[in-house]
């Protein structure tokens, strides 16, 4: 008997495009003006908008709907709060555009950024029309995600001095709008869009996957899609649905259940998928809204070897469908790693250093920026060093500050179970195998700005500066390998699109007729770290 273990994968196979002379050559099983591939937030929005324009819409979804939107925090980035929506928006729009221009670093045009900023208030109002609810209550501290009852916050680097824009706004408004909900808001966010999709009369086909596109050979127009559909009423179809619900609840099954169980689930899902039947559907235009490639183990091994894969279903099938008809992919090696060290809100008062003991990043920046600096420039290894005063304040916030359990519990464990304690800088340097002189220099360079003598060399704002006055120090391992501190990742690369109309473009820069991209399949540009 062979001891070789067979790899079981649920990655969607995407076939070569089916080229035909005309639509009449295909025996279509269904037809619609618009077929949307993927029923997450972007797919739902595309379907609703198409219905409002009078088009017949068919939404095809591999699972039951929701995609990454359900697993998200349900946060919408927009340049307005309720109090400013009725005021002239030019000053706020210009400030938002300037900030985003700094963040995205040229990945999209200035015109697109300006349009996004200008339309963000309209987009927020549109979401409210679909049933989503927003509010303006804010937490009193910097956080990666606000607690229940708090629905507006600084969700990026807006308050970091290096990202500010004093010529336009002395203090930018918060732009992270969390959908009002109990618990993480992603489910409520998608529930509103799902309900609106159905209310608008869009048809849906769930537990079905698009395996290839159909193209008119001479014109290059995408005519339709070939879909694998699980048979209705089959026990395997019901099992597939239940297993997908299990995966959705756990967000990333390999982190929540034993590996043996995870493998069994993947095998069961693969067996269910093999019972599907193939049917072609004719379309007038086809928006791809299938989710990202962070779950595609082959793609991750190629572009980011050593990184773990993400949520189930994020296999890049929408991207590969676009590539099958000549769509161009860009920045597939651009993976955003989120190392949030707030809350506790006082942690950024500490020092983040590399394994040589050198400070390399402003500790108060957005988690994606810190994660980028750590992963791309420091080999995924870093330490957060705090003193007794910061640790005491952080512990109080974890216990009594109303934080989420996923924020407070890891922080407490890291401070009191994982952290390495040093009686002095020299003692800590010895335990961390660092040069004591190098580490001491970091504290000297941090203490002088804290006393107001000089500016912080990495641009930390005055309220986040902290003078270390001696006593015990605690080094917290915030590396990617730290099992008590999971590192979330998101793929940012994707299909290149015409920024004016969303059409997927080919290698020559021309629109591919009939094919559009929305959501994650097109190149993601928020945020783009520098």
Curated annotation (Swiss-Prot):
Transmembrane regions listed in the UniProt entry: 395-415
Temperature note: Optimum temperature is 40 degrees Celsius.
Keywords, in A-Z order: FAD, Flavoprotein, Lipid metabolism, Membrane, Oxidoreductase, Steroid metabolism, Transmembrane, Transmembrane helix
Compartment(s): Membrane
Cofactor(s) for this UniProt protein: FAD
Pfam families for the chain: FAD_binding_2 (PF00890)
The enzyme's E.C. designation: 1.3.99.5
A GO biological-process term: steroid catabolic process
Single GO molecular function: 3-oxosteroid 1-dehydrogenase activity
Regulation acting on activity, per entry: Inhibition occurs with substrate concentrations above 25 uM.
Gene3D superfamilies: FAD/NAD(P)-binding domain, Succinate dehydrogenase/fumarate reductase flavoprotein, catalytic domain
Record field: catalytic activity: a 3-oxo-5alpha-steroid + A = a 3-oxo-Delta(4)-steroid + AH2; 5alpha-androstan-3,17-dione + A = androst-4-ene-3,17-dione + AH2; 5alpha-androst-1-ene-3,17-dione + A = androsta-1,4-diene-3,17-dione + AH2
Family: Belongs to the FAD-dependent oxidoreductase 2 family.
UniProt name for this protein: 3-oxo-5-alpha-steroid 4-dehydrogenase
């Amino acid at each position: 008997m062979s001891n070789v273990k067979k790899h079981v994968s649920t990655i969607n196979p995407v076939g070569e495009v089916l080229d035909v002379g005309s639509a009449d050559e295909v025996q279509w099983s269904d037809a619609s003006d618009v077929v949307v591939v993927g029923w997450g937030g972007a797919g739902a929005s595309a379907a609703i908008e198409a219905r409002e324009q009078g088009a017949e819409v068919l939404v095809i979804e591999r699972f039951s709907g929701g995609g990454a939107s359900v697993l998200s925090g349900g946060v919408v980035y927009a340049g307005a709060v309720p109090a400013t929506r009725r005021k002239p928006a030019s000053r706020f729009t210009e400030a938002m555009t300037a900030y985003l221009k700094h963040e995205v670093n040229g990945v999209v045009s200035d015109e697109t950024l300006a349009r996004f900023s200008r339309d963000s208030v309209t987009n927020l109002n549109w979401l409210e029309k679909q049933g989503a609810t927003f509010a303006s209550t804010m937490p009193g501290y910097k956080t990666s995600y606000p607690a229940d009852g708090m629905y507006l916050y600084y969700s990026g680097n807006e308050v970091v001095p290096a990202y500010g824009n004093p010529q336009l706004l002395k203090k930018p408004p918060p732009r992270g709008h969390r959908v009002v909900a109990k618990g993480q808001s992603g489910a409520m966010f998608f529930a509103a869009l799902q309900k609106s999709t159905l209310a608008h009369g869009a048809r849906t086909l769930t537990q079905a996957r698009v395996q290839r596109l159909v193209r008119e050979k001479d014109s290059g127009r995408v005519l339709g899609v070939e879909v694998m559909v699980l048979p209705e009423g089959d026990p395997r179809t019901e099992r597939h649905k239940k297993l997908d619900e299990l995966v959705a609840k756990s967000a990333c099954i390999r982190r929540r259940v034993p590996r043996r169980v995870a493998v069994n689930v993947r095998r069961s899902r693969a067996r269910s998928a093999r019972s599907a039947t193939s049917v072609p559907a004719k379309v007038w235009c086809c928006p791809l809204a299938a989710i990202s490639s962070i779950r595609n183990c082959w793609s991750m091994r190629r572009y980011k070897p050593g990184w773990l894969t993400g949520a189930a279903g994020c296999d890049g099938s929408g991207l590969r469908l676009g590539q099958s008809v000549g769509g161009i992919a860009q920045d597939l090696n651009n993976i955003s790693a989120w190392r949030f060290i707030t809350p506790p809100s006082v942690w950024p008062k500490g020092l983040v250093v590399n394994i040589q003991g050198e400070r390399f990043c402003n500790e108060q920046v957005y988690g994606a920026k810190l994660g980028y600096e750590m992963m791309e420039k420091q080999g995924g290894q870093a330490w957060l060093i705090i003193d007794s005063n910061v640790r005491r304040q952080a512990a109080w916030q974890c216990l009594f500050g109303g934080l989420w359990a996923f924020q407070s519990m890891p922080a407490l464990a890291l401070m009191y179970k994982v952290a390495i304690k040093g009686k002095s800088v020299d003692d800590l340097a010895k335990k961390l195998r660092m040069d004591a002189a190098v580490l001491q220099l970091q504290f000297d360079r941090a203490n002088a700005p804290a006393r107001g003598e000089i500016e912080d060399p990495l641009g930390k704002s005055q309220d986040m500066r902290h003078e270390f006055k001696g006593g015990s120090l605690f080094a917290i391992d915030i590396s990617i390998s730290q099992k008590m501190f999971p590192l979330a990742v998101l793929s940012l690369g994707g299909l290149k699109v015409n920024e004016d109309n969303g059409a997927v473009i080919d290698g020559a820069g021309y629109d591919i007729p009939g094919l559009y991209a929305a959501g994650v399949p097109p190149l993601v540009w928020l945020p783009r770290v520098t």
